[in-house]
Amino acid sequence: MTSKKTILLVDDDIDLLENTSYMVKSMGHDVITAQDGLEAVLKYKDIRPNLTIMDIKMPKMDGFDAFFKMKQFDPDAKIILITAFSMDEKKHLKAKSMSLITTIHKPYSFEQLEEMVNKYA
């Protein structure tokens, strides 16, 4: 059994956020949630999670801009971006150059999520 970690989940889709939160909690980890990039950055600074899993397309601040702010605050931040859409290739390349772990596409399975959390948290 892996040790309990704190995971920050960020998505503006409430149903997906609740389902993903349930899945991560079922793995034995603590979950903190945010519904937009701005809230995510503030919570990241406050809790310093072991891993952040964040949607790209969100209101107030998108996932890329939140990623850049988190990395500016903590260059060692572990962040996975998720998307259901095509992405801004320039921002994606910049994020990869700043140690973006990976980008996964919606819908993702419990197994994919579990693998990512176990590997990177």
Language-model-derived ranges and their functions:
Residues D65, S86-I104, E111-E115:
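Alpha4 helix (beta4-alpha4-beta5 surface) of REC/receiver domains from two-component response regulators
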Residues I14-I32, M98, Y120:
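Two-component/phosphorelay signaling modules centered on CheY-like receiver
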Residues I47-I53:
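Active-site beta3 strand of CheY-like receiver
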Residues M1-T6, E111-A121:
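Non-catalytic signal-transmission and effector/linker regions of two-component phosphorelay proteins
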Residues I82-T83:
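Hydrophobic/aromatic residues positioned on beta-strands within the core alpha/beta folds
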Residues M58:
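Receiver (REC) domain active-site loop signature in two-component systems and cognate sites
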